A protein has these predicted regions:
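Conserved small/polar residues in nucleotide/adenosyl-binding loops
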Residues: 137-142
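Residue-level signal for well-ordered alpha-helical scaffold segments within enzymatic catalytic domains
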Residues: 26, 132-136
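Acidic/His- and Gly-rich active-site-bordering loop/insert found
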Residues: 2-120
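Active-site alpha-helical elements of protease catalytic centers
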Residues: 120-133
């Protein structure tokens, strides 16, 4: 990869690190374990809230978003060829909390340089990082 591009990406990450962490924390705070299906929330209230928050974050970054009947959603950035897509598939639901947590699993924290909380690595954190990567592309490419 171009060294100049690496430096630009590093600068973008440094400039946006605190907001990125806040966005991950906001998603982690949503208990998105599958719940009882109800009108407008086929997987329960928690997964619906996480979907809504994710689409809100994407829209705030200037991406076009679509909620597909509350089952899933997506954000997109128009490209030169509308027939071609690059997709990053993530999810924002989590499995039930198991034993061994020594702190609230829905309150993200940083410990010894690690992010801890339900979904930080599977898959809420990667979802937010993906949105920031697309946002960087949107802001920097012609």
């Amino acid at each position: 990869m171009d060294q100049g591009l690496n430096q630009k990406i590093d600068a973008y990450i440094a400039e946006n690190k605190e907001q990125l962490l806040q966005d991950i924390a906001a998603l982690v705070a949503i208990d998105s374990v599958e719940g009882t299906p109800e009108e407008g929330a086929p997987f329960g209230k928690g997964p619906r809230a996480a979907l809504d928050k994710t689409l809100e974050l994407a829209a705030g970054m200037g991406l076009a978003t679509r909620n597909c009947e509350n089952y899933m959603g997506y954000a997109e950035l128009a490209g030169a060829d509308p027939e071609k897509y690059l997709a990053a598939i993530c999810h924002v639901d989590v499995v039930p909390v198991g034993n061994g947590w020594t702190a609230d699993p829905f309150k993200m924290r940083i410990q010894d340089g690690w992010l801890l909380g339900r979904g930080v690595s599977d898959d809420k954190g990667p979802m937010v990082v993906t949105l920031y990567a697309v946002s960087y592309t949107h802001l920097t490419l012609p």
